[in-house]
């Protein structure tokens, strides 16, 4: 009897050792792709930008997004930030450069002319169409005589060419978006921004030759494309005169 008990005990111990999974074998087991513990993707969900009411209104009026015509043109809409003379975000979630179609096509031509001269440079747009109610806020904010005020902001009663989508504020920049030195910042209110006083400011040591050359290059490509500048802002270019704009376009309120 003892002999049979010993045999059963021996077989039991031997069978446990034989079928016990090895530690190394367990470690090497790879999880299946359909495992309940499969790690979810960490890729962020892309949020589609909302189209503002202003942009919908511009599209209905026939204006176009400049970057839809030429995506190489750089955009930094200053009134969609606090980096402007108002120090206020005037446009909210609208941060695109919309212009009348024929005006936008001129900007594209200016970009092409610039690329022919220097492919390492690009136009950088600061402002394009501007609703008249924004123009009114700017007009009200400038505390100076009207004779001085009209040098920097058009009277909203008459309508600025920006209000028609027929003017653009811009500069030159590297392909990384770094603006070239023009001697003043955008929206600088003062004679240092006057194209008509550049040589005078050069002689006075207030502008450098390089800064003036940068301005001249900007004017050159814009002139070639059919724009003309104004006397008090190196960054501002008109596509036509106000009388023509009234005949051709609806003002953006």
Predicted regions and their residues:
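Positively charged n-region of N-terminal signal peptides that target proteins for export
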Residues: 1-5
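C-terminal motif of bacterial Sec signal peptides marking the signal peptidase cleavage site
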Residues: 14-15
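Extracytoplasmic cell-surface/polysaccharide-interacting catalytic and binding patches
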Residues: 19-128, 141, 145-232, 241-253
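Beta-rich nucleic-acid/ligand-interaction surfaces
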Residues: 132-138, 237-244
